Amino acid sequence: MHKAPKGTALAFDFGETRIGVAQGDAELGLSHPLSTVTGGSNDEKFAAIAKLVQEWQPRYFVVGLPVHTDGTKHEMTHLSRKFGRRLNGRFNLPVYWVDERLSSVYAESLLSEAQVFGKKRKSVLDQVAAQAILHGFFEGGPAECFNGREG
């Protein structure tokens, strides 16, 4: 258990094709879907993220860490960690990794309840998953912090 830091956060549901982004504030306990970063090179993706960082001025990042249902590493675990380290390196902000095991299931459930289907669903699914990741972080779920130093 942890207490989420004060201030604005940007959360990411990292994928090689799409990166869902959510924004929130721990003090208010609120988070909302923000954007989906798609396609292009890593430089193009980070340019899009830089615009969001400039607009929202976060104090830290939260990145979903994919693991299997039994808690073992997933093939995307390493890539998500690498993405988080790159965020830290480019923006010099702490990164919190959180277990994202059920974020997509939660996002699918929310979108079904809201009757969001088809192309609209695909366009917001990763954002809503990022929102679920951030919500779990705000609720005090387990998290691991990276602030530019290994160990």
UniProtKB/Swiss-Prot annotation:
Primary residence: cytoplasm
Pfam families: RuvX
Enzyme Commission identifier(s): 3.1.-.-
The keyword Cytoplasm appears for this protein: yes
A Gene Ontology cellular-component term: cytosol
GO BP of this protein: rRNA 5'-end processing
Compartments, record wording: Cytoplasm
Matching InterPro entries: RNaseH-like_sf (IPR012337), YqgF (IPR005227), YqgF/RNaseH-like_dom (IPR006641), YqgF/RNaseH-like_dom_sf (IPR037027)
Gene3D superfamilies: YqgF/RNase H-like domain
A GO molecular-function annotation: nuclease activity
Keywords: Cytoplasm, Hydrolase, Nuclease, Ribosome biogenesis
Family listed: Belongs to the YqgF nuclease family.
Function summary: Could be a nuclease involved in processing of the 5'-end of pre-16S rRNA.
Matches recorded under PANTHER family: POLYNUCLEOTIDYL TRANSFERASE, RIBONUCLEASE H-LIKE SUPERFAMILY PROTEIN
NCBIfam families cross-referenced by the UniProt entry: RNAse_H_YqgF
Name of this chain's protein: Putative pre-16S rRNA nuclease
Originating organism: Neisseria meningitidis serogroup C (strain 053442)
